[in-house]
A protein has these predicted regions:
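Enriched for short, Lys/Arg-rich terminal
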Residues: 2, 7, 11-15, 22, ...
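N-terminal first-folded block
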Residues: 9-42
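A structure-centric signal for secondary-structure junctions around beta-strands
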Residues: 25, 41, 55, 74-76
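A short, surface-exposed loop/turn module that caps and links secondary-structure elements
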Residues: 32-58
Length: 89
């Protein structure tokens, strides 16, 4: 599965320390390789609000979340936001 980052997610990533950015990048790569398995776990959940239709949340660490969506035509994981749990939604 290909990975694309939105401009907002790139800006979000820059706010993290270098070790955190490495962790986040590794977890996003893991997500792209194991999406179907993670979808059946509690680590990946679909967001339910109308504003977030067809978007998912992935838990990276205790307080770090990634919001993303799957684009059907190319099976691409588009990372929309990366941030702390309290401020990402």
């Amino acid at each position: 599965m290909n990975i694309k980052y939105s401009e907002k997610s790139i800006k979000d990533l820059k706010s993290f320390s270098h070790p955190d950015r490495i962790l986040i990048a590794k977890k996003i790569e893991y997500l792209s390789e194991n999406f179907e398995i993670l979808k059946s776990s509690k680590k990946v959940t679909e967001l339910k609000d109308c504003e977030f239709k067809n978007q998912f949340r992935f838990i990276i660490a205790k307080k770090i979340r990634v919001l993303f969506k799957i684009e059907n035509s190319e099976i691409t994981l588009l990372v929309l936001r990366v941030g702390l749990r309290k401020s990402i939604y």
